């Protein structure tokens, strides 16, 4: 298929969409998804390379590399690799090896991956990513869930996996579309799972914003949910509203206050002036990469060496999706919505759906179980993991898959 001409505007106009066809599921409705494959126009790739070749690098103060943000020397090499050696087409091919679809829901064209599980009775499972991630985060996790026997696990633990791009993120973004907060995203995903794909009962898993989406599903649609699995606990993030009742809570409150003081600046600007920042990051690929890469380094279990955990290709596949779709500004909206909405996850919200949680040691916040139990009243599994960080599906896909299997094994028939 010949690429459409690229006019220099983002998001690029060259999405390749195959003819409509029904997706696997228990029942279909009039909302028929269309099969989808990603294809960025050659002209958009050339435009990116040209922009990278003209990168204007900032000065850097003397001192420890990464002490003030993204390190200049590392970033210069990363930009060179992106311009000269990175193979975007290989990443497209990898993503396109998974069945993808688009369906119009709530006024947007929602993109999602849907992989039916192996075996006779795979359980439906929704995976929700966060910021600054994308569906690329889950590509190593998906086959471990849909075909566990291939990885030495029990084939009876198979899931049929659905991975949407969050509205306003990546391939679920088009210029001018409505912005979605967490409540609206959860409602959209519930409609996808039940009204479009026909899953009357399903599980949900997520970290970062995905953990809040998952919690919201448990609050709003408990009758549909078989279970919830979280790799970030979405409670106890507001230091002003917390008072320590135990030594463990006191320790956590100190850690939270230190993190908010030194690490939360990104959230303040994304939550107060998202449009201002969007101009810079939508126009400069190096600026976009710097903004995202610094978080992958700071939030992962990499001991300061980001390339010991992620390859450059993994990082650039995710960054590239933000770049080519022009979705970075829209992706900030959950931060703005959270600061300007009365809806929060706190002890006034009670989740009764069976819940499991993995605490990875380098997660950005790790509330103690006593705080979690104020909201999640049926915690079936609480696991403290030996290694890993915020991007668990990328950092520790096998460990995360095993935890998900263990939680849902007894819940499939409840």
Residue ranges and their predicted role:
Residues 122-130:
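Short beta-strand element of the alpha/beta-hydrolase
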Residues 28-46, 51-52, 56, 226-320:
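Alpha/beta-hydrolase
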Residues 270-414:
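C-terminal subdomain of alpha/beta-hydrolase-fold enzymes, centered on the catalytic histidine
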Residues 144, 148-151, 196-247:
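Conserved hydrolase catalytic core segment
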Residues 183-202:
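Conserved acidic catalytic loop of the alpha/beta-hydrolase fold
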Residues 88-90, 153, 157, 162, ...:
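Glycine-rich "HGGG/HGxG" loop immediately N-terminal to the catalytic nucleophile
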Residues 131-143:
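The serine-hydrolase catalytic nucleophile loop
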Residues 44-117, 314, 323, 330-345:
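Non-catalytic accessory segments flanking enzyme active sites
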């Amino acid at each position: 298929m010949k690429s459409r001409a690229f006019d220099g505007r983002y998001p690029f106009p060259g999405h390749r969409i195959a003819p409509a066809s029904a997706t696997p599921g228990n029942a279909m409705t009039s909302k028929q998804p269309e099969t989808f494959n990603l294809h960025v126009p050659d002209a958009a790739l050339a435009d990116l390379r040209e922009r990278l070749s003209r990168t204007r690098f900032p000065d850097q103060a003397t001192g420890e590399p990464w002490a003030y943000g993204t390190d200049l020397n590392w970033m210069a090499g990363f930009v060179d690799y992106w311009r000269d050696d990175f193979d975007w087409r290989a990443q497209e091919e990898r993503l396109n090896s998974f069945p993808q679809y688009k369906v119009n829901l709530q006024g947007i064209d929602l993109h999602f991956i849907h992989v039916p599980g192996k075996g006779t009775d795979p359980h439906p499972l929704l995976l929700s990513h966060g910021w600054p991630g994308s569906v690329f985060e889950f590509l190593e996790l998906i086959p471990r869930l849909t075909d566990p026997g291939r990885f030495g696990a029990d084939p009876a633990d198979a899931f049929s996996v659905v991975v949407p791009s969050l509205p306003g993120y990546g391939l679920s973004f088009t210029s001018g579309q409505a912005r979605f907060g967490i409540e609206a995203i959860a409602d959209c995903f519930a409609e996808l799972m039940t009204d479009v794909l026909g899953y009357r009962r399903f599980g949900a898993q997520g970290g970062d914003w995905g953990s809040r989406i998952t919690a919201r599903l448990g609050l709003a649609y408990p009758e549909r949910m078989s279970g919830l699995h979280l790799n970030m606990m979405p409670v106890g993030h507001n230091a002003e509203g917390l008072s320590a009742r135990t030594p463990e809570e006191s320790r956590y409150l100190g850690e939270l206050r230190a993190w908010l003081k030194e690490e939360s600046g990104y959230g303040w600007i994304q939550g107060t002036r998202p449009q201002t920042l969007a101009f810079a990051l939508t126009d400069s690929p190096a600026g976009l990469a710097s903004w995202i890469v610094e978080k992958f380094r700071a939030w992962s279990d990499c001991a300061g060496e980001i390339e010991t955990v992620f390859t450059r290709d993994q990082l650039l596949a995710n960054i590239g999706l933000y770049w080519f779709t022009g979705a970075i500004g829209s992706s900030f909206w959950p931060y703005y919505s959270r600061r300007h909405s009365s809806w929060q996850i706190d002890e006034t919200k009670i989740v009764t759906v069976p819940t499991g949680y993995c605490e990875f040691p380098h997660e950005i916040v790790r509330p103690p179980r006593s705080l979690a139990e104020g909201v999640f009243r049926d915690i079936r599994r609480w696991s403290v993991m030996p290694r890993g960080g915020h991007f668990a599906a990328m950092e520790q896909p096998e460990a995360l898959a095993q935890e998900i299997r263990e939680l849902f094994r007894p819940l499939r028939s409840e």
